[in-house]
């Protein structure tokens, strides 16, 4: 039993609040345990120069932690005059994860900006950002679809993310900060509803791990990703019915 009372294969409570802010086409507050992230999706009727004239859209992400989202104050990137490596890595991960879910040709020449602001961090901020941002993305795309229906609905499948790790000798799902801090192995896994992998980021923090342990962690991640997708479906309700249909 973990310090929180959770079983090793149990995720933290998930709460997804849609339409959390007024102006963004999609906005979500996602809470996974004590980790809280505001995710917004904003639409621009243009694409980066390398996509002009291609007929394809683009999705890109920015990630930020509020200064007191952590136990001690974290300096804003803007005050350091550069984006730190961790922030850059995470926002690229979020962008890749969401682009994998979308038919860019069906989206057309539009850019969807995903902004993830961590309000409170207690482990799993990148995976929480991906899970919440997907819901914000669906809301933004649905608003486009209501204004002018797509010939083919562009979102192809659900995407969620979850962390897994080895703490002591136990393989556990959805690590909080206390667990992440002492984990021998720490892994972030992004998956589709069909059980396909989009990205696997794994590190042996305290030494190597075996292929058997890797397989066990991935099996655990698949269980967690399904639970996260169910939370997305519960939040979206009937607004998710177009996903994966490719219908006109």
From Swiss-Prot:
Its EC number is 2.7.7.56. SUPFAM superfamilies: Ribonuclease PH domain 2-like, Ribosomal protein S5 domain 2-like. GO terms for biological process: rRNA catabolic process; rRNA processing; tRNA processing. The keyword Hydrolase does not apply. One of its GO terms (molecular function) is 3'-5'-RNA exonuclease activity. NCBIfam families: RNasePH. This is Ribonuclease PH. Keywords: Nucleotidyltransferase, RNA-binding, rRNA processing, Transferase, tRNA processing, tRNA-binding. Homohexameric ring arranged as a trimer of dimers. The lineage of its organism: Bacteria, Bacillati, Bacillota, Clostridia, Eubacteriales. It comes from the Bacteria. Belongs to the RNase PH family. It catalyses: tRNA(n+1) + phosphate = tRNA(n) + a ribonucleoside 5'-diphosphate. Transmembrane segments: none annotated. CDD domains: RNase_PH_bact (cd11362). The keyword tRNA-binding applies. InterPro entries: ExoRNase_PH_dom1 (IPR001247), ExoRNase_PH_dom2 (IPR015847), ExoRNase_PH_dom2_sf (IPR036345), PNPase/RNase_PH_dom_sf (IPR027408), Ribosomal_Su5_D2-typ_SF (IPR020568), RNase_PH (IPR050080), RNase_PH_bac-type (IPR002381), RNase_PH_CS (IPR018336). Phosphate binds at residues 86, 124-126. Pfam families: RNase_PH, RNase_PH_C. PANTHER family: EXOSOME COMPLEX COMPONENT, EXOSOME COMPLEX COMPONENT RRP41. Phosphorolytic 3'-5' exoribonuclease that plays an important role in tRNA 3'-end maturation. Removes nucleotide residues following the 3'-CCA terminus of tRNAs; can also add nucleotides to the ends of RNA molecules by using nucleoside diphosphates as substrates, but this may not be physiologically important. Probably plays a role in initiation of 16S rRNA degradation (leading to ribosome degradation) during starvation.
